[in-house]
Amino acid sequence: MEIQQTHRKINRPLVSLALVGALVSITPQQSHAAFFTTVIIPAIVGGIATGAAVGTVSGLLGWGLKQAEEANKTPDKPDKVWRIQAGKGFNEFPNKEYDLYRSLLSSKIDGGWDWGNAATHYWVKGGQWNKLEVDMKDAVGTYNLSGLRNFTGGDLDVNMQKATLRLGQFNGNSFTSYKDSADRTTRVDFNAKNILIDNFLEINNRVGSGAGRKASSTVLTLQASEGITSSKNAEISLYDGATLNLASNSVKLMGNVWMGRLQYVGAYLAPSYSTINTSKVTGEVNFNHLTVGDHNAAQAGIIASNKTHIGTLDLWQSAGLNIIAPPEGGYKDKPKDKPSNTTQNNANNNQQNSAQNNSNTQVINPPNSAQKTEIQPTQVIDGPFAGGKDTVVNIDRINTNADGTIKVGGYKASLTTNAAHLHIGKGGINLSNQASGRTLLVENLTGNITVDGPLRVNNQVGGYALAGSSANFEFKAGTDTKNGTATFNNDISLGRFVNLKVDAHTANFKGIDTGNGGFNTLDFSGVTGKVNINKLITASTNVAVKNFNINELVVKTNGVSVGEYTHFSEDIGSQSRINTVRLETGTRSIFSGGVKFKSGEKLVIDEFYYSPWNYFDARNIKNVEITRKFASSTPENPWGTSKLMFNNLTLGQNAVMDYSQFSNLTIQGDFINNQGTINYLVRGGQVATLNVGNAAAMFFSNNVDSATGFYQPLMKINSAQDLIKNKEHVLLKAKIIGYGNVSLGTNSISNVNLIEQFKERLALYNNNNRMDICVVRNTDDIKACGTAIGNQSMVNNPDNYKYLIGKAWKNIGISKTANGSKISVYYLGNSTPTEKGGNTTNLPTNTTSNVRSANNALAQNAPFAQPSATPNLVAINQHDFGTIESVFELANRSKDIDTLYANSGAQGRDLLQTLLIDSHDAGYARQMIDNTSTGEITKQLNAATTTLNNIASLEHKTSSLQTLSLSNAMILNSRLVNLSRRHTNNIDSFAQRLQALKDQKFASLESAAEVLYQFAPKYEKPTNVWANAIGGTSLNNGGNASLYGTSAGVDAYLNGEVEAIVGGFGSYGYSSFNNQANSLNSGANNTNFGVYSRIFANQHEFDFEAQGALGSDQSSLNFKSALLRDLNQSYNYLAYSAATRASYGYDFAFFRNALVLKPSVGVSYNHLGSTNFKSNSNQVALKNGSSSQHLFNASANVEARYYYGDTSYFYMNAGVLQEFANFGSSNAVSLNTFKVNAAHNPLSTHARVMMGGELKLAKEVFLNLGFVYLHNLISNIGHFASNLGMRYSF
């Protein structure tokens, strides 16, 4: 039979992705590791190694018991074997091309039409149970096989080892099988010198559309002594049950190799299994493009050679690929068991059975029994094995494909191997994510994993997922050996809800960035050794890791949410280290984030840099040690506080800690200063006390700073000249403080000598000059001492103080206290050295002459050194000392006082006094005004007072409630309009409902009444359940407020003795506010609830309404200028309102009652109020501010209603509301001593217009829409709201 020679590619039938996607979503995802290690590996070793399964490799990776049994299945015995031998002529022309089918095969291959599958297929002459052997071992030249499609068996063996085989010159080839009761396997073997694949090649495909008989299994073996290649257009497709054996010196497949391809509708319902065996390839196997899965849970296996290269690997979302590398030394043949001499054994058994035992009990078993025992050969089953040390799997890029099918827990694609090295190139990995989430597992059971490229989600580096649909990367190295290494040589950037899991002995990362939005999990809990990360950037990230080494940890806040931490959620062990910690500055205090640790024995940090509004909570780690630096990353601009929390903290040798009130350091356990230095930063004339929850230890040595000649200090106070005088400044407090000299090996809590040695290592500096002790060796030292203590005479005339040369002088204006519970200094002011004033000691002349230490014999009890001594301050200026005016005068800017009053008034002046003087001191105030021009000061004060006045305003505090109430007023008016359709019903309800069913037919029911009830619309006023989405905004010169939310209710028309409408509602709205300067931001949750009614008396309508509202507001002040930064804070309060309304109106009906005009008048009462402010600030906190107001209003309105059809309507309502009385009380807002009184609002006049309507969508289902605008004609504030909703009648 002729075969097709035209150029064709395979045409696959279309399938319903929606149908099969829904079905496959309920198929449970199974782990294939168990089959890999307990079934597949033994099958390989017991099958290939023994040679018992030659040609049956389809069983080696069958992914189930049946497939494992196939590994050792002997080939099916053919009924008849046809043999063809190439005779003379085929061995004479090496450059000639032949058509293999026409030249040799056609005489023993039949073909015909398969009516069940509507396609032509071919088979060995006589039937699929026969075999064809073609002997061409001496043939030369090139033999083309093209168009042999749907070859369904039996076996075909072509030996042409000196010739070239070209598959698919004009058309592709497909080798497959028929599934019958014999469950036969089709085996096709080609043995050639070279094999070229130029067109599609299919293995175990279904014939035609695939709707008919299923294929069983097919094994295609291609063996070439030199090489096997395919072109880019030659696609090789392996369907369920397909095996491809490749044996050659090298294999290079440039076209796509598709394992687990689908062909027919319904194939999605079950996974597919396919295998490629390259174990007999001596060189490298190269797959340019390998695809596993086709919208199905395909499971594929490659029995690999030593080196396997894959350009692009495409995995379907639920597919799995296993690449099995050979063991060290390759597969070895095993000895075959010798058959037992069963006849002799049986004879011996019979003799023994007929004999009498020692207990005279005879075994009844007659001799020469026909019962035979057949002993089978012993089967040797090997367990899992590691790939040889030189086995490598290289994949340039891995990509997963997905559809929108939703499955609980998502889908997982997997790549598993046992090679010594699994290397993923610079193309990296792309995970296609969809709803319910997707996971990619890359696993090397016995070796290492290296990834050179990035990790992408939906083809984006840093791509994100959605909550509940996370994208997950999983890597497992050395799962069985527990000795694998996972290495990532490219920076990893993970978007929101993208997770990374790594199990290995050692994991190495160049960089990981989860700071793009947070909500990530880095699960390294399966790393048994060390996790090494060069740079880790986090934001609200869950990090599960133990025993790590992080070169740099950067913690962002990103304003994700209040209290969103990066959480190290595993015990970090005792060998964890971070070289540098950087806490980035938060956006504002309510958006603070940070990092916390679950538990751990010890954490070593080399350098620690903290920032405002960020947290570091290590209280659950037993010990933390700082080895080099502990400082603020924003020391020149400390505009917010950090929160740093430790259990036991150690400052290592030569480490430096910068400490101020902005550090906000908590040590709940012990603190050890092991020869480090604490730099105390003076802010506002004070230093912050370092409080230790339990014990503190100060360990020092006799080491000398070669640059200064002083002992290396343990505590330093920088800018000590700015300390407030006549005040004790406590540096450290603890339950117990001990002191120790590590050079001498002594330590004690109360040893006087050790305490005095410690005091010499407590230093006060003015810039770089020490001011508590001066060591004078020459005139330059005299000048330096004068600079330190502020003595200009010593600087200008050092010769007058030459008597100090060779001596150490102690500044007795500074006293130091060190005992078992406190370390402090007391600054009276600098004393002045005199020639006979004492307080000096001679410098030693030995080898330690450079050491600047003061002798204990120095006077320490001078009268002016006592804490009780206070200087006599005298006001030398026009204004009292300590006022903001005095600060301007001392700065020689007296005229700016008048400018301040003229432009900012007394309120601005009082605010400046509070911010600079009352909350700090005159020194701080002087620094602020020196750095700020007068114009800028008044500008900032005016902006602040405007904002504070807005905060105090009850109108501002209840603005969101008013907008929500306005939205509901519009909705309620729409409901009343709808239920007031009293004039258009000209026929009774029964007749009207019957009219609606005209010309309709129904199945026989029990009664006509049942038909009427089930199918006719309800024209009587029914009970209605309604819901609306609402939105609104408030606009004025100071800023704008917006609101969005939902409202729902139920109402009904009562038609008894009294015609009336009654209803109730509830609503929720979230509002936000931003002023124009963006210095005031608010967010509030608001609720509104109430009842409404309308009573009819002929054309008269009486409306009544009562409602209440409550709002919880969270606001923050965010001034950017340094002058106002103390105002920045978060605060909250509650706002509430209650209202009752009553109105009367009269209906005028026109146009056959379709148009109704209704004028109305009404009165209302409103009660508005707010609670006191609660602030998180400890500097200038907002307090008090509660308000209450009662309003009485009168209104006049006119309304037009237009009813059309049986259910739809449109209306417009316009009116004026006039306040005729208001009274109330308010508690002034306070900022320390500064007060802000809420202004009393005048009586207001409001104009309002609203319109809306409703449209029927389906039986008893309606859509409504409305708009409303309210304008205060006095304050020029406008409120706008709209709604979109649904109603259901029943």
From Swiss-Prot:
Pfam families: Autotransporter, VacA. Residues 340-362 have a biased composition (Low complexity). Residues 326-374 are annotated as: Disordered. GO terms for cellular component: cell outer membrane; cell surface; extracellular region; periplasmic space. Residues 363-374 have a biased composition (Polar residues). Keywords: Cell outer membrane, Membrane, Periplasm, Secreted, Signal, Toxin, Transmembrane, Transmembrane beta strand, Virulence. Residues 330-339 have a biased composition (Basic and acidic residues). Residues 1-33 form the signal peptide. Residues 1018-1290 form the Autotransporter domain. SMART domains: Autotransporter. GO terms for molecular function: toxin activity. InterPro entries: Autotransporte_beta (IPR005546), Autotransporte_beta_dom_sf (IPR036709), Vacuolating_cytotoxin (IPR003842). Induces vacuolation of eukaryotic cells. Causes ulceration and gastric lesions. The signal peptide, cleaved at the inner membrane, guides the autotransporter protein to the periplasmic space. Then, insertion of the C-terminal translocator domain in the outer membrane forms a hydrophilic pore for the translocation of the passenger domain to the bacterial cell surface, with subsequent cleavage. This is Vacuolating cytotoxin autotransporter. The lineage of its organism: Bacteria, Pseudomonadati, Campylobacterota, Epsilonproteobacteria, Campylobacterales. The gene is vacA.
